[in-house]
């Protein structure tokens, strides 16, 4: 019966707000695991990934793979992008953000970026000094 948990599996009933809090906690923990300190959640929004990742996305996919993510299975899917302020970018630069892509309460991608015109985008892996 698909509605019954299998052996060793537990099902928990949570409200929407409890799920959102759990996902935000997961995001914050993930960023911390990579070495990032955040100023908290800035925004979250639904975004649809492209149906296919052509040559334009090679650099972006490479950043994802560097951090252990593989976005190809999520092509065409609508994900939630959680954006956090980053407080400890090694150069001390301001206005640095972390974006995490979440699909069905699972983090499937992310990056570190700045919003400035001459900005950058890197993987979630904390840069070596």
Identify the role of each PLM range.
Residues 33-93:
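Mature extracytoplasmic domains of secretory-pathway proteins
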Residues 1-2, 129:
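Accessible peptide chain termini
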Residues 75-129:
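Extracytoplasmic electrostatic interaction patches
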Residues 9, 15-18, 33-35, 56, ...:
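Intrinsically disordered, low-complexity N-terminal regions enriched in serine/proline/glycine
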Residues 1, 36, 68-69, 96, ...:
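Intrinsic structural disorder
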Residues 2-40:
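N-terminal, intrinsically disordered, polar/charged segments of Gram-positive cell-envelope systems
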